[in-house]
Amino acid sequence: GWPAYPGSNGIRSSVCQKKLGCGSKNLASLGVCKAFCLGRKRFWQKCGKNGSSGKGSRICNPVLAHAVEKAGKGLIKVTDMAVATIIKFAG
C-alpha cells in the first residue's frame, strides 16, 4: 500500500532538511539534499495523501512513494540520481 502521509508540516522542505541533517551528516551534499526535500514536497502535493489526486500519473505509485519516504527518513541514501528522478517526474 501507500506509505503514511507525513502531514502538511512533515512534507515541508525545511522540516525534511532538518530531519536529514542536510549538509552536516555524510548523507548528501546540501544542494542534493535541498533538491530532494523540494522534490519530496512536490511529490506529496501532486499525489495527495494516498496517491489518489495523482491518478494516471506515472510518478504517483506506491513503490516510488515508499522510496521517497525511506530517503526522507534517512533510511536510504539520497543520491543525485534519486533526486533527479523525483524532480523529473514531480517537477
UniProtKB/Swiss-Prot annotation:
Name of the protein: Parbolysin P6
Function as written in the Swiss-Prot or TrEMBL entry: Cytolysin that shows hemolytic activity (on bovine erythrocytes, HC(50)=5.75 mg/ml). This hemolytic activity is completely inhibited by small unilamelar vesicles composed of PC/PG, PC/PI and PC/PS in 1:1 molar ratios (with at least 100 mg/ml concentration).
Tissue: Localized within the skin and proboscis and are most readily isolated from body mucus secretions.
Coiled-coil region list: none
Disulfide bonds: 16-37, 22-33, 47-60
Native source organism of the sequence: Parborlasia corrugatus (Antarctic nemertean worm)
Key words, A-Z: Cytolysis, Disulfide bond, Hemolysis, Secreted, Toxin
GO CC term, one of those recorded: extracellular region
